[in-house]
Amino acid sequence: MGQLQERFKHYREPQKFMEADVYPYFREIEGKQGTEVEMGGHKVLMFGSNAYTGLTGDQRIIDAAKAALDKYGSGCAGSRFLNGTLDLHVKLEKEISKFIGKDDCLCLSTGFSVNQGVIPALLSKDDYVICDDRDHASIVDGRRLAFARQLHYKHNDMADLERVLQKLPQEAIKLIVVDGVFSMEGDLANLPAIVELKHKYNCSIMVDEAHGIGVFGKQGRGVCDHFGLTDEVDLIMGTFSKSLASIGGFIAADWDTINYLRHTCRTYIFSASNTPAATAAALEALHIIQQEPERIQALWDVTNYALKRFREEGFEIGETESPIIPLYVRDVDKTFLVTALAFKAGVFINPVIPPACAPQDTLVRYALMATHTKEQVDRSVVALKKIFVEQGIIK
């Protein structure tokens, strides 16, 4: 056995949870994702999905993907930089730019690769990147790859952000990178305050709208639109794997910035372009959310109902303002146990443990789709309350 393999010989943390029959990962779904799914012959209510608009099984999107597969084939066999650009990619970029309200955008193969590639491309060794403590892992990896000096501030603490900015040279390039909606806790970035600090300290802002698009703003344009601050935010990132029922991501900005990124962003230049089917699916989903505002209203109706029910039943749900509802457990082992018991009771939810949160902040993440019904919410709340009470988490 080599030295590398020797390092991992004693890594058995997952096996501890497997032996206790509470291991929650890599469960196989046997069919389309919807509000109910089949897993191992077991039907469960799906409250673990990021498909906020409920479009992943929509026949119009499936048909669009099939048509693209027939016309273009299964893949592009190259990067966008060389032989991998389809007219379909360009059409999606034009429509995303218009939808978001920016001059231009780039579409990449995953949302993760957007943050991983854009942040290093933008910044050099004399620049500064400033991030919220709870920014997504893709932002964390992006700033680690950048040569810029890396700073962070306490979660949504504007006084702490100002403390950080006060110490930086006024003339230096300073990029604040923040999630619009925080993916585990469901709260929103304080964009109005961040924009004020941008002007006070001569900064730029990049907002990750992965969990904001299809949820907030006019026709689901995101948190920047929700606050009326699209023009104040320099770069807006988004993903196609959540509300847009596909896979991929984008970065939208002014023409000059996108022109620069198109020729320097390594995850764009050196990755194969997104598949025709995935591109067509995202494009069709974008059309649907603009044509069907009632879909977003349905999402908010069921979200507000679920928030009310969880509060009434005594769950600790933090400061969420979105369809992401954190149900705090505050114990790692109990978080795994609650997840396993919920699955056995017919409710699929996701455990959130370190490093995604601090050990004292563990939770199960409950997320809603526009297609969920109040009856499904009620069934899940009843099942989860029984488990939380039995485990001594709530009374």
List the predicted regions and their residue ranges.
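Active-site phosphate-binding strand-loop segment of PLP-dependent enzymes
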Residues: 151, 155-207
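Conserved PLP-anchoring active-site segment centered on the Schiff-base-forming lysine
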Residues: 118-137
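Conserved PLP-binding catalytic core of the aspartate aminotransferase-like
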Residues: 297-304, 311-346, 356, 360-361, ...
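Conserved N-terminal alpha-helix of the aminotransferase class I/II PLP-enzyme fold
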Residues: 63, 67-111
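N-terminal "arm"/small-domain region of PLP-dependent enzymes with the aminotransferase-like
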Residues: 5-74, 203
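Active-site C-terminal subdomain of aminotransferase-like
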Residues: 201-204, 211, 216-321
